């Protein structure tokens, strides 16, 4: 596997965690579980690097593919309806793995542009970190200005 520059995909609004919330695999770093749904989690970049379970191939995002190269999987819509979760599958360029990353930060499935990748309003504590890491669920909800703090995303590497 060639080296890919990886970036975090993070909520532009930090909400209640100064480290920010990043799209994250369930489980810890290299031991993350590809069979579990994606979530958002305190971003790990404060530790000095992009973590493998939050590291997306920056070159593929512009083509609408959210690829985690360490695990060789892509973000996929679980089912084509509002409140769908986001799962991980082998990358196959199927429409369920194609997203539009709009200039304002909204991430929409190509087949359903009325839905936006959304972090949940409620949160829970994770297993580690000081202060403790926070987790929010990730799903597709109707794009709505009142949810903008939980629907507008950016990408960043570690400077």
Provide a role label for each language-model segment:
Residues 1-159:
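Lectin-like carbohydrate-binding module/patch detector with strong preference for beta-trefoil
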């Amino acid at each position: 596997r060639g080296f890919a520059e990886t970036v975090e995909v993070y909520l532009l609004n930090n909400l209640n965690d100064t480290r920010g919330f990043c799209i994250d695999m369930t489980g810890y770093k290299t031991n993350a579980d590809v069979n579990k749904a994606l979530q958002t989690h305190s971003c790990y970049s404060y530790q000095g690097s992009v973590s493998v379970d939050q590291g997306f191939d920056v070159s593929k995002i512009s083509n609408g593919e959210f690829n985690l190269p360490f695990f060789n999987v892509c973000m996929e819509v679980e089912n084509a309806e509002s409140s769908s979760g986001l799962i991980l599958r082998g990358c196959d360029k199927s429409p369920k793995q194609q997203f539009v990353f709009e200039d304002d930060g909204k991430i929409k499935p190509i087949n359903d542009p009325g839905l936006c990748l959304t972090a949940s309003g409620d949160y829970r504590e994770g297993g580690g970190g000081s202060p403790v890491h926070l987790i929010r669920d990730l799903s597709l909800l109707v794009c709505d200005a009142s949810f903008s703090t939980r629907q507008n995303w950016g990408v960043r590497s570690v400077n």
